[in-house]
């Protein structure tokens, strides 16, 4: 019997506990072909390893069949099959449970107490926007995505550095990247004093112009030998720019903005023990950032001990010999391709139509973000130049298109209601979800709506992971939205949702609309994690 919000993780945990001690044997099915006959499977090979001759004891069958507990989905049947132990859920009951509480499946719950504090540092934002490399753009988009996901889960995030270049600020607005701005630099006097004290009068006469001194970091690297710092790090040349970077980080940690957002300063020296610093850097910046991390620890005994690095892999564009495109050039290329593709589809020059300007801007950003974020951030990314990524089922445009189809569907229902074709939407508690028996409907609920928040929480883990690098899976949301779009598109093309205005058909129509309400909410939450607003038309 299910209690509370249903969860795939909770159900799997209960299933494995029912089998007894040992490694997990159950997994959730995802393929449509398998979901026609089962929802979970314990493979025969795993059962043979667990039980003598693969014979499952009768007590295990009974325990699985009577499975219940917080978050555990209700079981219909459990039976041995050639593939293994097959389990099917009470699908109408699962539909009713999930679709009767949409918000708890589409919106992350805020914790009762304040979450941890995170300083999220993206060095690429100190660059000039006109020279921003594609690998740096990738780091910026990954950082923005992380900020949104962390805040959605109640984590207090302070984004560093505040952007001072107005051209960079304008470019970020085009990309729908939310980042704080500032007009003044922080003071570096205290850090400069620390540097001079560490030099102990041993200032070198041969230092390059603008360098205050050379500080040895070798001892720190050796002390943290297993942490993951590059063993070749020896020393760091300290400049005013380096001190400015450290001063910004120091300010973010000690003078925490209220609510984790830029704004009035919170209480000074808010404590560093509960603070995690995440440096999101391009692969070209990784070595220098390790030096700055160590230098901060050397100069400031109150620097956070928990500093993690996320190194984004290189980005290359195929078909562009010689010099790589800058980030603004890449944006203009994708924007032009979006406008061209839309002109071919709709005819005429819609790019000059003010009503379409914002739509094209959003589609361009969606194209870029899905290209940049659909690959694991640590991996190399190869972008196509001439082959436009706005086409096909794996593009951001495809996701935005299907989100717009949902908007059109509900607008159609609204107009039908106003014209008297359909009755107003009944209470959800009165809907008959046993009328949802199409395999596409279960696919949408079981693969998308039900596991969505669990997937979102797996994007980044702030748990005490050893080592310098933080496990981050920023590709998960993009891949999820693409798969959801494919499943929804297949269902929508095959099933007529708004049927004939006949009373005996309304029950199934309303059950389907409630399911698609859930799909719409999941779409909107997922897109919000990418900084993308849903479109009502394309």
Curated annotation (Swiss-Prot):
Alphabetized Gene3D superfamilies for the sequence: Isoleucyl-tRNA Synthetase, Domain 1
Subunit structure: Part of a complex containing tRNA(Arg) and METTL2. Interacts with tRNA(Arg)(CCU) and tRNA(Arg)(UCU). Interacts with METTL2.
The protein's role, per its UniProt record: Involved in tRNA methylation. Facilitates the recognition and targeting of tRNA(Arg)(CCU) and tRNA(Arg)(UCU) substrates for N(3)-methylcytidine modification by METTL2.
PANTHER family recorded: DALR ANTICODON-BINDING DOMAIN-CONTAINING PROTEIN 3 (PTHR16043:SF1), DALRD3 PROTEIN (PTHR16043)
Domain of life: Eukaryota
One GO-annotated biological process of the protein: arginyl-tRNA aminoacylation
Coiled coil: none
Cited SUPFAM superfamilies: Anticodon-binding domain of a subclass of class I aminoacyl-tRNA synthetases
Organism: Mus musculus
Gene Ontology molecular function: arginine-tRNA ligase activity; ATP binding; tRNA binding
Disulfide cysteine pairs (residue numbers): none
Protein name per its UniProtKB record: DALR anticodon-binding domain-containing protein 3
């Amino acid at each position: 019997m299910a209690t509370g919000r249903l969860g795939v993780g909770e159900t799997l945990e209960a299933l494995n506990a029912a089998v007894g001690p040992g490694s997990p044997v159950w997994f959730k099915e995802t393929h449509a072909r398998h979901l026609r006959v089962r929802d979970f499977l314990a493979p025969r090979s795993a059962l043979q390893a667990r039980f003598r001759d693969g014979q499952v004891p009768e007590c295990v069958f009974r325990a699985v069949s009577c499975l219940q507990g917080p978050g555990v989905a209700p079981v219909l049947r459990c039976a041995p099959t050639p593939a293994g132990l097959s389990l099917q859920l009470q699908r109408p009951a699962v539909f009713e449970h999930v679709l009767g509480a949409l918000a708890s499946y589409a919106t992350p719950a805020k914790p009762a107490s304040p979450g941890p504090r995170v300083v999220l540092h993206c060095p690429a934002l100190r660059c000039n926007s006109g020279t921003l490399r594609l690998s740096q753009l990738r780091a910026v988009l990954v950082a923005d995505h992380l900020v949104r996901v962390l805040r959605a889960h109640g984590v207090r995030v302070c984004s560093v550095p505040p952007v001072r270049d107005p051209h960079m600020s304008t470019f970020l607005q085009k990309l729908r990247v939310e980042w704080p701005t500032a007009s003044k630099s922080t003071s570096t006097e205290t850090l400069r004093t620390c540097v001079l004290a560490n030099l102990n009068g041993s200032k070198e006469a041969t230092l390059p112009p603008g360098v205050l001194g050379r500080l040895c970091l070798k001892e720190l690297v050796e002390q943290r030998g297993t942490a993951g710092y590059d063993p070749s790090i020896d020393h760091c040349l300290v400049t005013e720019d380096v001190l400015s970077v450290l001063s910004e980080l120091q300010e973010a940690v000690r003078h925490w903005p209220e609510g984790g957002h830029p704004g009035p300063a919170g209480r000074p020296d808010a404590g560093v023990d509960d603070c995690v610093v995440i440096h999101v850097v391009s692969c070209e910046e990784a070595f220098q950032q390790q030096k700055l991390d160590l230098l901060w620890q050397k100069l400031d005994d109150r620097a956070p001990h928990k500093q993690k690095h996320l190194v984004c892999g290189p980005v290359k564009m195929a078909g562009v010999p010689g010099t790589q495109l800058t980030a603004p050039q890449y944006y203009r290329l994708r924007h032009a391709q979006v406008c061209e593709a839309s002109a071919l589809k709709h005819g005429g020059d819609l790019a000059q139509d003010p009503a379409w300007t914002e739509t094209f801007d959003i589609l361009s950003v969606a194209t870029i973000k899905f290209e940049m974020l659909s690959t694991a951030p640590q991996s190399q990314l190869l972008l196509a130049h001439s082959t436009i990524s706005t086409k096909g089922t794996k593009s951001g445009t495809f996701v935005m298109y299907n989100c717009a189809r949902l908007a059109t569907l509900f607008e159609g229902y609204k107009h039908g209601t106003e014209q008297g074709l359909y009755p107003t939407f009944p209470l959800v508690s009165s809907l008959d979800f046993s009328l949802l028996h199409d395999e596409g409907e279960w696919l949408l609920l079981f693969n998308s709506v039900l596991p969505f928040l669990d997937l979102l929480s797996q994007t980044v883990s702030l748990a005490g992971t050893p080592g310098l690098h933080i496990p981050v899976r920023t590709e998960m949301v993009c891949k999820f939205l693409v798969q959801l779009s494919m499943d929804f598109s297949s269902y929508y093309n095959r099933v007529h949702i708004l049927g004939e205005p006949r009373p005996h058909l309304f029950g199934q129509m309303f059950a389907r609309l409630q399911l698609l309400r859930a799909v719409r909410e999941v779409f909107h939450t997922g897109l919000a994690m990418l900084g993308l607003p849903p479109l009502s038309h394309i």
